[in-house]
Amino acid sequence: MISSQIQDGETVGKYSCPTASKRYPSDAAIMSVSETEEKNAVVVEFSRDVEREVVVGIYANVIIWPIATALFCYLAYTLNTTGLPYVFIDEKFHVDQTLRYLRGKWYSWNGKITTPPGLYLLGWLQYHATRFITNWSTLTVLRLTNLIGGVIVWPWVVLRPLYLFNALGFWPVTLMCFPLMASYYFLYYTDIWSTIFIVESLNLALVLPFGETASIWMSALCGLISCLFRQTNIVWNVLIMILVVERRAMIEKNFNTLNFNNYLKLVLHTLENFKSLVLPYAINFGLFLAFLLYNRSITLGDKSNHVAGLHIVQFFYCLMFIAFFSVPVWFSKQVTLSYLIRFVMNPVKYLLELLGIMLIIRYFTVVHPFLLADNRHITFYLFKKLIGRSSLFKYCVMAPIYHFSAYVYLEVMRPSTMIFHPILPIEIKNPIDLPIQLTHISWTALIMCTFMTVVPSPLFEPRYYILPFIFWRLFITMAPEPFWGNPIGKVTGTKRHLSECAWFMIINLITYIIFKRFDIKWESETTVQHIIW
């Protein structure tokens, strides 16, 4: 983390008799030497703690990855052979469109599909790449697209370079096990490769593996490709562009503690370096605008059931899911007490915030017909049994939960943001040497991008929360505090990393048990249906 740069201005001491002073140093000199040695010892101990944490993290990833991969591959095998050897829910549309491409019908489009053809083009490539080496069914081969992406490309190609720059922040193997992604490794859905391409765009922008210019253009290209899987990824292109500009502006324009000035410096740097930093992403925005004008909607196909609106409660749903999945990251005595102290010290402010949330619940809640009609999704039961159980429950129970979730979302990020000196410039002079952290500018951009991607959607769909969680999680440094107790002042995030990985696998296990245990029959479907996210 970039912190305030402190310059040591203390003097050791001056002696009237040089000879005597060498033999008999003053008390001030002794104290100064002692303090210096103590500081050096602290630095050495801290470095050892960091080194130990990094080494343990590397070993943990190397050990856990093959175990998790074998488990996911086994589950994929059982589902494709006995558990689910037929198309499931939206797969009927995705597989149908891919089959049209495989038959050479490139201009035929399934009217029920709402996303661009990125997945179907990738499925076409996957099929032709594997048809000579396997006699598996077409459905199995197409599902293999997401399994390969989830257990190989996602942790090793996308997350590994980011991990090398933020080894204390996250483990790639943990994010590989993230439940909202892992559940779709076995199905033919758009979410896995949508996430892979847009986070790879972030990876290229931060790590710069091909040099600055080439990496930024490749980042923009990956961002554009990601929009072929999900249109709302254009919003995350904005965040990545802001990060690209910001990481250079903070060095060349000398960011300080005056936030408004930093915004002005960012704008000025954007204008001065438009061609090299902004143009690659501006091309994406121009192409997306052309698509909107041509299609007259952000949605392809079934526009009537996917009309954009102002579903602000969706933002609280997203924060609630983020808080739930990140329990091992934030749960501690300090977070709990600070939230309670905030309430006790300023109850009026707390009640006004709750009132604001209740008003949003009242006037900006959208209940889509699909939510109430499709009992094959966990959200159906969450809304029926919890969120929309009754008016009393909706306002008196869910509003405080939303409030606490928002508090967790903000407070966990706060210690991980960069801090600048009010006067002194940043010592780092190359963007690639900067830590993977947000500033107050990119932090605000992250919140706004999350809001813009989830609020317009009328559907209560947890898959839409994958990228808000991933982008939030990648920029967080794991808290060193124990789960319950006083801070010990050491770098000790390993237990939390292990707990986070275990937490994800427990959730995956529960969702798999629900999937296998409960069979649902629909009159319109000839096959047995199951429950997924």
UniProtKB/Swiss-Prot annotation:
UniProt-annotated location(s): Endoplasmic reticulum membrane
Residues glycosylated per entry: N80, N135, N295
Reactions that this protein is recorded to catalyse: an alpha-D-Glc-(1->3)-alpha-D-Glc-(1->3)-alpha-D-Man-(1->2)-alpha-D-Man-(1->2)-alpha-D-Man-(1->3)-[alpha-D-Man-(1->2)-alpha-D-Man-(1->3)-[alpha-D-Man-(1->2)-alpha-D-Man-(1->6)]-alpha-D-Man-(1->6)]-beta-D-Man-(1->4)-beta-D-GlcNAc-(1->4)-alpha-D-GlcNAc-diphospho-di-trans,poly-cis-dolichol + a di-trans,poly-cis-dolichyl beta-D-glucosyl phosphate = a alpha-D-Glc-(1->2)-alpha-D-Glc-(1->3)-alpha-D-Glc-(1->3)-alpha-D-Man-(1->2)-alpha-D-Man-(1->2)-alpha-D-Man-(1->3)-[alpha-D-Man-(1->2)-alpha-D-Man-(1->3)-[alpha-D-Man-(1->2)-alpha-D-Man-(1->6)]-alpha-D-Man-(1->6)]-beta-D-Man-(1->4)-beta-D-GlcNAc-(1->4)-alpha-D-GlcNAc-diphospho-di-trans,poly-cis-dolichol + a di-trans,poly-cis-dolichyl phosphate + H(+)
Keyword presence, Transmembrane helix: yes
UniProt KW tRNA processing keyword: no
TM stretches of this protein: 54-74, 139-159, 162-182, 184-204, 205-225, 234-251, 274-294, 312-332, 351-371, 392-412, 440-460, 465-485, 498-518
GO molecular function: dolichyl pyrophosphate Glc2Man9GlcNAc2 alpha-1,2-glucosyltransferase activity
Record-listed E.C. numbers: 2.4.1.256
Enzyme class: transferase
Superkingdom as given in the UniProt entry: Eukaryota
Keywords, comma-separated and alphabetical: Endoplasmic reticulum, Glycoprotein, Glycosyltransferase, Membrane, Transferase, Transmembrane, Transmembrane helix
Protein name: Dol-P-Glc:Glc(2)Man(9)GlcNAc(2)-PP-Dol alpha-1,2-glucosyltransferase
Source species: Kluyveromyces lactis (strain ATCC 8585 / CBS 2359 / DSM 70799 / NBRC 1267 / NRRL Y-1140 / WM37) (Yeast)
Upper taxonomic lineage: Eukaryota, Fungi, Dikarya, Ascomycota, Saccharomycotina
